[in-house]
């Protein structure tokens, strides 16, 4: 029997997911931007069902998680799966936890008829980039991510 188990998250996982998110934000040097709360996670993942998560355990110990949502490709005419965050605690890395989460997400994408499975990675995270190449992922160098947030988002929404 494998030491790794992966399951869908449940509302009682919200605090643990928030811990993972904060650990990830610290690793990415983005702690100041992390304003999520466990209540927000419970609302958007389990009440509104705007996103989903999987929890990874190693020999029963909390090891990591993946948070994802569905988007849509107009060109493919099919949904896609977008991985927002994946985090594995340092003590559990290099044991196949991340690969197990990716495999579970790929299976979910295939089962749901998704035409693609995408995510973003910080350009300085070379270990993650190497790992993703090993999975068969390819960079989308011709695309540049764009984001509206804060006052810019509010200003555009107020336009008449």
Regions found by a protein language model. Give the residues of each.
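Conserved GNAT acetyl-CoA-binding A-motif
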Residues: 110-120
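Conserved beta-strand in the GNAT
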Residues: 55, 61-69
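Conserved acetyl-CoA-binding loop-helix of GNAT-fold acetyltransferases
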Residues: 94-107, 134
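Conserved GNAT-fold acetyl-CoA-binding loop/helix
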Residues: 18-43
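A short, internal acetyl-CoA/4′-phosphopantetheine-binding micro-motif in the GNAT/acyltransferase core
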Residues: 86-93
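A short helix-loop-beta-strand connector motif used in the catalytic cores of GNAT acetyltransferases and
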Residues: 43-55, 82
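A short beta-loop-alpha structural element at the N-terminal edge
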Residues: 5-17
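Conserved beta-strand-loop-alpha-helix junction that forms the acyl-donor binding cleft
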Residues: 119-128, 147-151
């Amino acid at each position: 029997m494998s030491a790794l188990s992966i399951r869908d998250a449940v509302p009682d996982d919200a605090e643990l997911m928030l811990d993972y998110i904060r650990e990830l934000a610290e690793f990415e040097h983005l702690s100041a931007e992390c304003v999520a709360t466990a209540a927000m996670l419970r609302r958007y993942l389990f009440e509104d069902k705007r996103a989903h998560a999987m929890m990874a355990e190693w020999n029963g110990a909390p090891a990591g998680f993946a948070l994802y949502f569905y988007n849509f490709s107009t060109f493919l005419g099919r949904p896609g799966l977008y991985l927002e965050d994946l985090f594995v605690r340092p003590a559990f890395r290099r044991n196949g936890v991340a690969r197990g989460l990716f495999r579970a997400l790929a299976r979910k994408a295939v089962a749901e008829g998704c035409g693609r499975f995408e995510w973003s990675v910080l350009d300085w995270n070379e270990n993650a980039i190497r790992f993703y190449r090993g999975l068969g992922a390819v960079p989308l160098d011709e695309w540049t991510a764009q984001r509206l947030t804060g006052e810019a988002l509010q200003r555009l929404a107020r336009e008449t």
